Design a protein with these regions (language model features):
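Long, internal scaffold/assembly segments composed of regular secondary structure
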Residues: 249-341
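Hydrophobic, ordered structural segments
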Residues: 104-139, 168, 172-174, 199-249, ...
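Hydrophobic alpha-helical membrane segments, chiefly transmembrane helices and signal peptide h-regions
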Residues: 14-34, 222, 230-233, 299-301, ...
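Short acidic, flexible loop segments centered on an aromatic residue
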Residues: 48, 169-189, 226-227, 281-309, ...
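N-terminal Lys/Arg-rich, disordered targeting/topogenic segments
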Residues: 1-8
Length: 467
């Protein structure tokens, strides 16, 4: 392809909430490089390139899943049970909701949230909650609505008898996504056919049972990577203890491997009572760790509450195997867990609570990335909602939570945790949150659940281009 001094070729690559514009003017750039400018004779002329505003998209987890149809047949296909409630927020004018199509393996009817582009690229956020009681599928599950990405760490799940873990792979893009699953358990890396080259068609979701790759694994971690289209990955775990429902929840993606991890919001509610009865070994609260490197990690787990109380637990995590650190004798409350490690780790937490009818519910709580100075979020309606802020930085922070004309300012001291009751189903704008990590917990008669508050999506800004 050729250019002339007066011709300009523009290529615009559109993506989720970002846009990149590349401008080439061959003759003009060559001349400027040779003669400079009047104001700076020795400096090549530059050009400011402004990205084209793009729509913002996030994908929610969808509804609860069962590996059968309504009649209990076809255990190779996932079918939905009930409907999740979704709350949304945007800095734009509106949020459009649509669904991704199910594949041959079924689907959770995930919601695609789209904030159309305006004069600038908007932000969009959301979360979902579902309380379900259908046969042996009972409990509360919550999840964040997430940006598509090429890498997701799912810290949670089990394939022991009575435990069903389903990975959902949602592709909101217009190209095929080729997905690889790196699966780890307490023995190390799971080597099984079918974990690589999983094709997820554009604008569809594929459901992948974890038991298809590994059986009788008490503790699992899954690293989901994709090429081509980007993916939003979640994991649903359901538990049946003999014949008694043992809970349901959704594992949201956690923070990437790091020597410092924060699980900002964990709910503990009568965990000792949840461990009574048969087949209850996995009802105890734990922090799950995985070291993806080659060296053992010395880990310190800091456990704190908003009233300033807390404890420290020391552990060792061997490389390449999943480690569960038991948390015994902690009173009921809303906690934050801070993990410091000598090697990069990923982390998540699980707790269990009694529910009506002698059942239990489990909750999985993901680690989270630090927020920027301003973030929007929306919390799906549910019982016993709290918003947790954790300040892992060395400086105190003044955080403002605004909903419409209402606002509240909180002092979050360095190293401290603050818990706040908040309105649900309304847009919340969080400011002053640079370096803060935040999460949401639910605690009620239906069980416990939670999700991390996601940072604002990175948006391209104007750049100065020189030859």
């Amino acid at each position: 392809m050729s250019t002339t001094p007066s011709s300009v070729r523009r290529w615009v690559v559109r993506g989720t909430a970002t846009a990149v514009a590349v401008v080439v003017a061959a003759g003009a750039v060559t001349a400027a490089h040779a003669i400079g400018t009047d104001s700076d004779p020795g400096r090549p002329a530059g050009r400011t390139v402004t990205p084209v505003p793009a729509a913002a998209e996030r994908v929610c987890a969808g509804s609860a899943l069962r590996l059968s149809d309504d009649a209990g047949n076809d255990a190779t296909q996932a079918s939905t049970v009930g409907t999740a409630t979704v709350a949304t927020a945007t800095t734009g004018s509106t949020v459009e909701r649509s669904s991704l199509d199910a594949s041959t393996t079924g689907g959770s009817d995930p919601r695609l949230l789209t904030a159309p582009a305006g004069e600038t690229t908007p932000q969009v956020a959301g979360s979902s909650l579902q309380s379900v009681s259908s046969g042996d599928l009972v409990g509360a599950g919550a999840a964040s609505c997430d940006d598509p990405t090429q890498s997701t760490w799912l810290v949670g799940g089990s394939t022991e008898t009575g435990r069903t873990s389903l990975i959902t792979l949602s592709n909101p893009t217009d190209v095929n996504a080729t997905v690889d699953l790196a699966i780890f358990d307490g023995s190390g890396t799971v080597n099984a056919p079918g974990t690589t080259g999983i094709v997820v068609a554009p604008n569809t979701q594929k459901v992948v049972p974890l038991s298809g790759f590994v059986s009788d694994a008490a503790s699992t971690v899954v690293h989901v990577t994709s090429s081509g289209g980007q993916i939003v990955a979640h994991m649903q775990e359901t538990v049946v203890r003999t014949l008694t429902p043992g809970g349901y929840d959704i594992v949201s993606g956690g923070a990437a491997p790091s020597r410092a991890q924060v699980i900002p919001a964990v709910a503990l509610a009568d965990a000792q009572a949840a461990q009574r009865g048969d087949d209850a070994a996995d009802a105890a609260p734990i922090v799950r760790l995985f070291v993806p490197g080659t060296k053992s990690a010395r880990v310190t787990l800091g456990i704190s509450t908003a009233d300033g109380s807390g404890a420290t637990v020391n552990a060792t995590a061997e490389p390449g195997v999943v480690t569960d650190v038991a948390l015994d004798d902690f009173p009921d409350g809303r906690y934050s867990f801070t993990v410091t490690s000598t090697e990069p780790v990923v982390a998540g937490a699980r707790s269990t609570t009694p529910t009506e009818g002698n059942g239990t519910d489990l909750g999985w709580f993901a680690s989270a990335e630090p927020l920027g100075d301003e973030t929007i979020t929306a919390i799906a309606p549910g019982e016993g909602v709290r918003l947790n802020f954790v300040n892992p930085t060395r400086e105190d922070r003044s955080v403002t939570v605004r909903s419409g004309d209402e606002r509240r300012t909180l002092k979050v001291l360095s190293g401290a945790t603050v818990t706040l009751p908040v309105q649900t189903a309304k847009q919340l704008t969080l400011t002053g949150t640079e370096g803060i990590v935040a999460g949401v917990t639910y605690r009620g008669a239906d069980g416990i659940a939670g999700f991390p508050v996601r940072p604002a999506t990175d948006v391209s800004t104007p750049v100065r281009v020189y030859p």
